[in-house]
Structure formats: structure tokens, C-alpha cells
């Protein structure tokens, strides 16, 4: 992953990253060997740009007074949205914890107190199909082909389906939404950092 995104580029893309560090991102990515290593260099760069765009939206761009998005960082054991992709609900905490080897059901606050665990949960969500939806990784790397069910649900290849996977119930199918424009804006900004704009 470090061959696709340098520390200086990471810092440029995430100006208000606060708690989220390059070293934690790289350490977490090592647990998901297919992340940013699938396809051509352009595909790998698009994947990093898309991942960081989606996580930037989920954390409100990392504004300094909210390093983990719009949620209070209390020490509760509730399974509310935490981390760069805002995993929620006990079933996601359980599955993510099992995948990364950490008991997040008993220790959900690790998703706000350990920056490597935070990135691991986000990458777990990114790399794992969210049934009946595909993984974001398979979409952005071109490895996914929509089924007739996907097409009927409006899921077709492209950046938009990533939002459907991550937060479709809240943001999709409602016409023009500021949330959607925000996600697209981060993606375009990140692609500019890679000198890959405009993309077809």
C-alpha cells in the first residue's frame, strides 16, 4: 500500500486527520493483502482514493473537534457508529472483531482508542461483501458484475454503488442529497492528488 500512497500524500489528502495516522493506516492495510494491490496502478490508486473519500465523509473530513465523526466518543458499550467507516450494530462489531482478532463485542471502544484497530474495522467492511451487496473492494477494482437483483436495486458498477454499500439505506434513492455530493467531492479531490482527474 505504501507504494500507492506515501505519508506526504496521505497527509495532503487528510488535512484534519487528527487521530488517524499514516502508520496506523499502513499497519491495518497489512491485514488485508488485497487492498490497494489488485489491478493496475491506476486501479490501486482509485481504490485508495475511494476508500479515503468514503471514510472522510463518514468522519466529516476529520474536523478537529470531532476526530471520529459526529458522534461523542464516550466509553459506552453500545454499538454505535465508530471508526473511519462508522461500523454500527453488534453484528458488525462481532464480525469485524472476529476478522481482525479482537473482541469488539466486549471492547467496542477499541474502535475509538486504537487507531490501527479503527482502520482495520474500516478495511474489514471495505473488503467484505455486505450481503446482498458486494464488497467495496470488488466494485472499485472492477471484479464485481451486478446480478439482475443488483440491477433492480440500482446497484451498477461505479463509485455510486460504494455509497449504497456503506450507507445506502440512509442516502440512496432520495434524489439529490448533500451527503452524496460530499462523498463525490472528497473522491474528486483525492483523485486530483493522484493527477487522475477527470476519470471516465
From Swiss-Prot:
Keywords from the UniProt entry: Antimicrobial, Carbohydrate metabolism, Chitin degradation, Disulfide bond, Fungicide, Glycosidase, Hydrolase, Plant defense, Polysaccharide degradation
Catalytic activity, reaction form: Random endo-hydrolysis of N-acetyl-beta-D-glucosaminide (1->4)-beta-linkages in chitin and chitodextrins
Transmembrane segments: none
Enzyme Commission designation: 3.2.1.14
Keyword Hydrolase annotated: yes
A GO molecular function held by the record: endochitinase activity
InterPro entries hit by this protein: Glyco_hydro_19, Glyco_hydro_19_cat, Lysozyme-like_dom_sf
Entry's Gene Ontology BP terms: cell wall macromolecule catabolic process; chitin catabolic process; defense response to fungus; killing of cells of another organism; polysaccharide catabolic process
Signal peptide: none
Annotated catalytic residues: 58
Cross-referenced Pfam families: Glyco_hydro_19
Family in the record: Belongs to the glycosyl hydrolase 19 family. Chitinase class I subfamily.
Known role: This protein functions as a defense against chitin-containing fungal pathogens.
Protein name as catalogued: Endochitinase
Native organism: Avena sativa (Oat)
Amino acid at each position: 500500500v505504501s507504494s500507492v500512497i506515501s505519508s506526504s500524500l496521505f497527509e495532503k489528502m487528510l488535512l484534519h486527520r487528527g487521530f488517524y495516522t499514516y502508520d496506523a493506516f499502513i499497519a491495518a492495510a497489512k491485514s488485508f493483502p488485497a487492498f490497494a494491490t489488485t489491478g493496475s496502478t491506476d486501479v490501486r490508486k482509485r481504490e485508495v482514493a475511494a476508500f479515503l473519500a468514503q471514510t472522510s465523509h463518514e468522519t466529516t473530513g476529520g474536523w478537529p473537534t470531532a476526530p471520529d465523526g459526529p458522534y461523542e466518543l464516550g466509553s459506552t458499550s453500545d454499538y454505535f457508529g465508530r471508526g473511519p467507516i462508522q461500523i454500527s450494530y453488534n453484528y458488525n462489531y462481532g464480525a469485524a472483531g472476529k476478522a481482525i482478532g479482537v473482541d469488539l463485542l466486549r471492547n467496542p471502544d477499541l474502535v475509538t482508542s486504537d487507531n490501527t484497530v479503527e482502520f482495520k474495522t474500516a478495511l474489514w467492511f471495505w473488503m467484505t461483501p455486505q450481503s446482498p451487496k458486494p464488497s467495496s473492494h470488488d466494485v472499485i477494482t472492477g471484479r464485481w458484475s451486478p446480478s439482475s437483483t443488483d440491477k433492480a436495486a440500482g446497484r451498477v458498477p461505479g463509485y455510486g454503488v460504494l455509497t449504497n454499500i456503506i450507507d445506502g439505506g440512509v442516502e440512496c434513492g432520495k434524489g439529490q442529497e448533500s451527503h452524496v455530493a460530499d462523498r463525490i467531492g472528497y473522491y474528486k479531490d483525492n483523485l486530483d492528488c493522484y493527477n487522475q482527474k477527470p476519470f471516465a
